[in-house]
From Swiss-Prot:
Transmembrane segments: none annotated. Pfam families: TCL1_MTCP1. InterPro entries: TCL1_MTCP1 (IPR004832), TCL1_MTCP1_sf (IPR036672). Gene3D superfamilies: TCL1/MTCP1. It comes from Mus musculus (Mouse). This is Protein TCL1B3. GO terms for molecular function: protein serine/threonine kinase activator activity. Belongs to the TCL1 family.
C-alpha cells in the first residue's frame, strides 16, 4: 500500500470533498476537483469476488462548463461526499472507506488518487 507523501510546499489533502456536479467535487477551500478517471477491476479471491475502484481527481483552476464527451465516466459508485478521517483514509457518505493512494503535484495540477476494495460473496 502506498502512503501519501507530503512535501513542505504541498498543501494537505482536502478535509472533505462534496459533489457539486456529476464529475466535479469541491473542497473546504472552494477548490474544484474534476474526476479525471475511474478505473474498476474485478478479481476472484477465494469464494469471493473483489471489485477495486480507483478514482483519479485533479484540482483544476478553470472548470469546463460541460462534461468532456471524449471520456464518459460512470460515477454511480462514487459517494456524494468524502471526509478525511486520517492521513490516508477518507469516509464516503455511503459509509465506505477509501484509501488515499496519492496526493501529489505535477506542474500546476494537484492530484488525488483514492481507491476502495469491495468484497462480494460468490
Amino acid at each position: 500500500m502506498a502512503d501519501s507523501v507530503h512535501f513542505p510546499w504541498m498543501p494537505f489533502p482536502p478535509r472533505f470533498l462534496v459533489c457539486t456536479r456529476d464529475d466535479i467535487y469541491e473542497d473546504e477551500n472552494g477548490r474544484q476537483w474534476v474526476v479525471a478517471k475511474v478505473e474498476t477491476s474485478r478479481s476472484p479471491y477465494g469464494s469471493r469476488i473483489e471489485t477495486c475502484i480507483t478514482v483519479h481527481l485533479q484540482h483544476m483552476t478553470t472548470i469546463p462548463q460541460e462534461p468532456t464527451p471524449q471520456q464518459p465516466i460512470n460515477n454511480n459508485s462514487l459517494p456524494t461526499m468524502w471526509r478525511l478521517e486520517s492521513m490516508n483514509t477518507y469516509t464516503g457518505t455511503d459509509g465506505t472507506y477509501w484509501r488515499l493512494l496519492d496526493h501529489s503535484q505535477m506542474g500546476d495540477t494537484l492530484q488525488l488518487i483514492l481507491d476502495i476494495v469491495i468484497c462480494e460473496v460468490d
